[in-house]
Amino acid sequence: MKERELRDLIAEVKTGRLSRRAFVQRMIAVGLTAPMVGMMLAQSGVPMQAAEIPYKPTKAGGGGHLKILYWQAVTLLNPHFAVGTKDQDGARIFYEPLAGWDAEGNLVPVLAAEIPSKENNGLTEDGLSVVWKLKQGVKWHDGKPFTADDVVFNWEYARTPETAAVSIASYKDIKVEKIDDFTVSVKFAKPTPFWADAFVGTYGMIIPKHLFADYIGGKSRDAPNNLKPVGTGPYVFDDFKPGDIARGKINPNYHLPNRPYFDSIEIKGGGDAVSAARAVLQTGEYDYGWNMQVEDEILQKLEASGKGKVLITETGNIEFIMLNSTDPTVEVDGERSSIKTKHPLFSDPAVRQAINVLIDRASMEKFIYGRTANATPNFLNAPEKVRSKNNKFEFNIERANSILEAAGWKKGSDGIRAKDGKQLKFVYQTSINAPRQKCQAIVKQACQKAGIDVELKSVVASVFFSSDTANPDTYTHFYCDAQMYNTTMVQPDAGFFMNQYVSWQAATKENKWQGRNVSRWQSKEYDDIFKQAEQELDAVKRSAMYIKLNDLVVADNYIQPLLRRPKVAATAANLRVPVSGWDNDLWMISAWYRET
């Protein structure tokens, strides 16, 4: 679609000749996501129109106890340190952002009084600033007022390198100023097409200045409230046992009328995905089960009982294998997997290329995941307009053998290939989960036929995805040769998702392994294109840049995409849950209720 045609359509929306819904549908047809269309319209002077969240209760409380099951247990409750989805969701019960993303990709105000637009003077033509007006009368759980000072503090807290916040990328390149007690200005150093990053969604949850001001920087991990949250959310902290359970009780002073419905809430951790699915769909012991990474055949049988249902929500999430670009066995200055080292096996491109064609993605989809995943050769899969058409996956054991043979990796008497005195054997880890162990087995079996010895390692999910920086078995430490997990796309723009491979995001001891580039893979070309994409206002050019970034990552084979995975949750038949593929599962926990 040409720029002139696009501008004409936007003009028709402004005058009312074309409905907003019809415009969104046209843009989705050419590859844009609904959230990106909403941002485009807002920048053009057409405010976002979030649909009202369905909510029937006429008073707060009275709903009893809400039981949520996360088979990966919550380990901390500070959103700025939450490297895993389960810790992000745990924090979302107590903390809130200025706005969240609904299912249609519209911004929904939470702590904001309204969504910035040109009509309310919140957005500028040049894309260099945004003005947020805050909701008045909101109180922290300890009774202190929520003000612009808290918003400015969160910017200072997250952007300080010594704080080692996983959210630093959203805050380090902006400037936030207090205009008055309930208004803040966010200023960008360069034109920014996707302005709804800081203070929005997953990395937008706001913590109170009066409790964290003394813990900015190097003392950040010492704050008592890292484990005892005092937020603005619908539930007040009650109890927390890291790695086990988090409990909350109704906030009697919540800033939305008639909410929340439930008197108390718990997120119980532990077990596995199958037992979690059974506890919701079959026995009804729990109301909601997160991340049903279970064979689809099992889910369908459990769902047939009628006590619950499976919710499938499309996302940009990707299950993938990551090959370590560094050496996990060598310690440099007290740090393993240091960016100063190279992996002894994977530094050979032929080895990475061979592994790529030894992965039977089609079988993983067909025999394990079914309707809950789709095989893909791309790391970046959403929105459709940035999904590369340049790649395809292949399963070919014969080709893998030929690649290795040509590169000088010869089979020994034990059947394992070797070169320059190094055997082709490595350790491949993931979290304990039946589908993941089956995927591991598929890869191991194929590798054996190519003369590669693969040792499988499984780590308890609550440990593997822990945000504890002292835990050496987390996926962010990556003290292993290869690992597999699912990374989530927590906003509709590709920028934050693709910063997982910029050099300045490498996970290191210095940043307490909070950097998003866990593989430590580095490319100057990638860095340069990423910087260009950050400030490119032309949507078509920007999309082409993200496709190029995807292709660079995929071509180097340190990253092996496997499956596009939607969100899959289990819920009680009478539980009403606003879902969104662009935000966390608990993004609108205040609106959950039971149909009676």
Which role does the model predict for each range below?
Residues Q72-A91, L111, V166, W195-M205, ...:
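A structural "hinge/loop" feature
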Residues M39-W71:
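C-terminal segment of N-terminal export signals and the immediately downstream linker at the start
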Residues S167-I216, D239:
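Surface-exposed binding/hinge segments that line
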Residues K67, V108, S129-V131, T183-S185, ...:
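General beta-strand recognition
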Residues L69-T124, E156, V230-T232:
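N-terminal lobe/hinge region of extracytoplasmic solute-binding protein
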Residues K2-L18, A22, R26, A51-G61, ...:
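Extracytoplasmic/periplasmic ligand-capture domains
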Residues A22-Q49:
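N-terminal export signals
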Residues L562:
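Active-site-proximal polar cores
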